[in-house]
Amino acid sequence: MEIATDKVGEVIVLAREMVQDSPAAEAELRGLVAAMDEDERAELLALLWVGRGDFEPEEWDEALEAAAEEPLSTLLDSQHVADHLEAGLELVGRSARDAED
C-alpha cells in the first residue's frame, strides 16, 4: 500500500466530523480526496472495502483493480467511511491510531 497512513488518518478524522453534520468537514474531505491522485483514491477505496469485509487483505490487488474503476462518489457516499478505513488499516497491518495522531 503506497498511500501515507497519515493521509488516511486525516480522511478518518474528517469523515467522523462530517457525520456530526459539519459542512466544513465535508467540504474539506471532498477537497482532500479530490486532490489525491488516482492511485491514492483507488487505495483509499480498496482499504475501505477491506475494512468493510468486501475483500480480504490477501485480495488487495483485486480490491485495488476494482477500486480503480469506481467513481470518487463511491468513497465519499459510503456509510461508516471512518470505521471501515480504520478497520482496513488494521487488517493490512497499519495502525489507525498512529494515523489519527
Region spans (language model):
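Generic amphipathic alpha-helical segments used as scaffolds and interaction surfaces in large
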Residues: 32, 50-54, 72, 76
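Short terminal alpha-helical segments
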Residues: 1-23
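Polar alpha-helical coiled-coil and adjacent low-complexity
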Residues: 17, 24-28, 34, 81, ...
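Short, hydrophobic/amphipathic alpha-helical patches that form generic packing surfaces
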Residues: 41-52
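Structural motif
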Residues: 32-42, 76-80
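Short, surface-exposed beta-strand/strand-loop-strand elements in extracellular ectodomains
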Residues: 55-66
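Short coil/turn segments at secondary-structure boundaries
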Residues: 46-48, 59-61, 100-101
